[in-house]
């Protein structure tokens, strides 16, 4: 029996795939547990429509990420973060990804998840720092962060 997988099934198929499986397995496990549906004309059309919608959404997300990367590449695109520091220019604490994301949202109206910032360790010094930001699976941008005395 040909079925269209609605979700990934280990060892059998991935979501959206159309495969031939034994009748008993299809009826008693896959269809019963809503992991697959029979590959009829109506179901195939629905799967194709879902795949097109997913591809369109992925393309839009990629285009949006590319646009944001271009905006961040501008020299004037700098996020200002203030911190207390000593005489030698070292901070009394550190600037974390959370502080950078909050400043980015306040100053540039761009909301990002703090896990998107690929900062190995918090910033401990005054001055400019380039922070890599993973905007999309295929798009990584550099965000300039200026830490100043505050």
Curated annotation (Swiss-Prot):
Disulfide bonds: none annotated. GO terms for molecular function: rRNA binding; structural constituent of ribosome. InterPro entries: Ribosomal_bL9, Ribosomal_bL9/RNase_H1_N, Ribosomal_bL9_bac/chp, Ribosomal_bL9_C, Ribosomal_bL9_C_sf, Ribosomal_bL9_N, Ribosomal_bL9_N_sf. It comes from the Bacteria. Pfam families: Ribosomal_L9_C, Ribosomal_L9_N. GO terms for cellular component: ribonucleoprotein complex; ribosome. Keywords: Ribonucleoprotein, Ribosomal protein, RNA-binding, rRNA-binding. GO terms for biological process: translation. Belongs to the bacterial ribosomal protein bL9 family. NCBIfam families: L9. Binds to the 23S rRNA. This is Large ribosomal subunit protein bL9. It comes from Leuconostoc citreum (strain KM20).
